[in-house]
């Protein structure tokens, strides 16, 4: 019997009741005859739960904003506000005042995040499989003078919502959020929690964890997330956590980190958002085009729109160099938000290179480099790297190229991103080249098209419910060092340069043995 199946049994056999004393919520249990339980030598989840419940609930003062806090009564088996609580609220508070927008929190615990967001004007529905968490959240909301809806329910191990119809009746939601349980299941004789606490804190052994269980639930016919809505998940950097964004990408969701919290012991908490990519954009596929970039520059299509071509007659790369598209290769372009040109086009091209590698990683179920720069090292198996200013390379040659182009017409500005990826074996005579199928045979052109569109959305899409674009300098540099570590040197005007880093704007920072040089143009540069 799983931890969650004990929840109803505990409540039905040994009911809890709630009383108020001087405005403070107290959780009490009925008088129990402990000697009627099995001997202590036999593990009994109900005994463990009730022994925990005999401990007095504690009061937590949680400051969620400067000079503004909550007073929360937290029963023993309910999760109290901790560092991860603060991180999750910090990320969600960046979305601004709720103004009546709807939010669902899964796993409310003491109600800290839900109550704080209700104070910001969100219409909050919250749920938890621990009935004591629902009792505590309801009482804490009343004590802190906010209105919200608390429902006993959540996800089961199969990815189905408990009390789904009741939860749906309060939706669909603009935001769904969950501080995911991440403790590993208890093994053998290891110390056990009570079953209610197990249900809220321990990751499931099924379906690759609760984060994937939620992903599976969203593929079913449920009316829970609004079009244009977003999911905010918080996880730790264990094996499942490191793979979580890759698995959401593979299922067709764009993802982007909102914030992180690093601990001295090496644990890292990450909060990321997930959304359906380019929902208001168009997607076109053509047999033949002169250039996908040129096509979008000449058309009036919504931001995020993508066009692909099976063959490009005049495909181009940096400095109008020819980009050959062989049959079965990928050639595509996107309309980007023109305000991005106020940023740094050089770094944007490097970020596009990260998107290409992200798409490959999602296809192979390995952690994304954009999720954290430490995920760049495992790519030694594929020997993927970024070569400044706009190329993705594998061990045997160039795999992909990226090009940002803009056009100004009066006050109207248009920005497009083009990406070309060799999927088959490339035969370029100008430089060593390779194809994705030299690395893996598991990705079709159709599948890669979906993955790269999701990756580009993850890098560049903007929206009121989407986190701001993060600075990926560390990730880009880590992928560049994969290329530099092969012993390559850089020459400009016959003078050898040592690459030492990149600037915030994506410029190369080099040293010629006498002084530092900052290079923003690839003209007259030679890698050898």
Place the predicted regions along the sequence by residue:
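SAM-dependent Rossmann-like transferase core, predominantly class I methyltransferases
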Residues: 35-116, 120, 160, 264-270
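Mobile active-site "lid"/loop adjacent to the S-adenosyl-L-methionine
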Residues: 178-214
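N-terminal lobe of the biotin/lipoate ligase/transferase fold
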Residues: 254-351, 355, 361
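Conserved Class I SAM-dependent methyltransferase catalytic core
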Residues: 212-263
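N-terminal amphipathic/basic-hydrophobic helices that include classical n-h-c signal peptides
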Residues: 1-28
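Long, positively charged amphipathic alpha-helical accessory segments at protein N-termini or as interdomain linkers
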Residues: 215, 233, 341-386, 394-528
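Short loop/edge segments at beta-strand edges and connector loops
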Residues: 152-154, 287, 386-388
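Conserved SAM/SAH cofactor-binding pocket of Class I
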Residues: 89-169, 175-186
């Amino acid at each position: 019997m799983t931890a969650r199946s004990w929840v109803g049994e505990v409540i039905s056999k040994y009911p809890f009741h709630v009383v108020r004393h001087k405005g403070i919520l107290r959780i009490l249990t009925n008088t129990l005859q402990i000697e009627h339980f099995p001997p202590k030598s036999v593990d009994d989840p109900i005994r463990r739960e009730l022994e925990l419940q005999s401990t007095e609930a504690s009061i937590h003062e949680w400051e969620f904003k400067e000079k503004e806090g909550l007073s929360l009564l937290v029963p023993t088996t309910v999760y109290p506000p901790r560092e991860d609580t603060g991180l999750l609220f910090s990320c969600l508070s960046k979305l601004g005042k709720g103004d009546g927008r709807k939010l669902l929190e899964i796993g409310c615990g003491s109600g800290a995040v839900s109550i704080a967001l209700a104070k910001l004007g969100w219409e909050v529905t919250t749920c938890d499989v621990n009935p004591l968490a629902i009792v505590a959240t309801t009482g804490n909301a009343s004590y802190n003078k906010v209105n919200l809806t608390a429902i006993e329910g959540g996800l089961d191990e199969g990815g189905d919502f408990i009390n789904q119809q009741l939860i749906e009746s309060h939706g669909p939601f603009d935001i769904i959020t969950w501080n995911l349980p991440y403790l590993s299941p208890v093994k053998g004789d290891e110390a056990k929690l009570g079953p209610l606490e197990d249900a809220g804190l321990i990751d499931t052994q099924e379906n690759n964890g609760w984060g994937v269980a939620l992903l599976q639930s969203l593929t079913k016919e449920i009316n829970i997330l609004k079009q244009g809505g977003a999911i905010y998940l918080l996880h730790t950097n264990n094996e499942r956590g490191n793979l979580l964004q890759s698995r959401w990408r593979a299922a067709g969701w764009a993802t982007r980190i909102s914030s992180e919290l690093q601990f001295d012991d090496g644990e890292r908490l990450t909060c990321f958002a997930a959304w359906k990519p380019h929902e208001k954009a168009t997607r076109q596929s053509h047999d033949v085009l002169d250039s996908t970039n040129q096509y979008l520059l000449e058309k009036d299509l919504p931001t995020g729109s993508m066009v692909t071509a099976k063959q490009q007659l005049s495909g181009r790369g940096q400095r109008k160099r020819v980009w050959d598209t062989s049959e079965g290769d990928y050639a595509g372009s996107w309309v980007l938000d023109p305000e991005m040109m106020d940023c740094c086009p050089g770094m944007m091209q490097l970020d596009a290179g990260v998107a290409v590698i992200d798409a490959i990683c999602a296809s192979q179920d390995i952690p994304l480099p954009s999720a954290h720069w430490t995920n760049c090292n495992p790519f030694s198996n594929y020997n993927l790297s970024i070569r400044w200013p706009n190329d993705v390379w594998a061990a045997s040659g160039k795999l992909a190229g990226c090009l940002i182009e803009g056009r100004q017409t009066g006050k109207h500005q248009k920005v497009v991103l083009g990406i070309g990826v060799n999927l088959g074996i490339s035969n370029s005579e100008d430089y060593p080249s390779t194809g994705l199928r030299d690395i893996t045979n598991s990705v079709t052109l159709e599948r890669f098209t979906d993955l790269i569109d999701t990756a580009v959305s993850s890098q560049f899409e903007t929206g009121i419910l989407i986190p701001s674009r993060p600075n990926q300098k560390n990730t880009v540099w880590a992928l560049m060092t994969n290329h530099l570590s092969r012993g390559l040197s850089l020459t400009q005007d016959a003078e050898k340069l040592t690459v030492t880093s990149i600037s915030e704007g994506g410029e190369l920072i080099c040293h010629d043995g006498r002084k530092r040089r900052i290079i923003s143009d690839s003209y007259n540069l030679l890698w050898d």
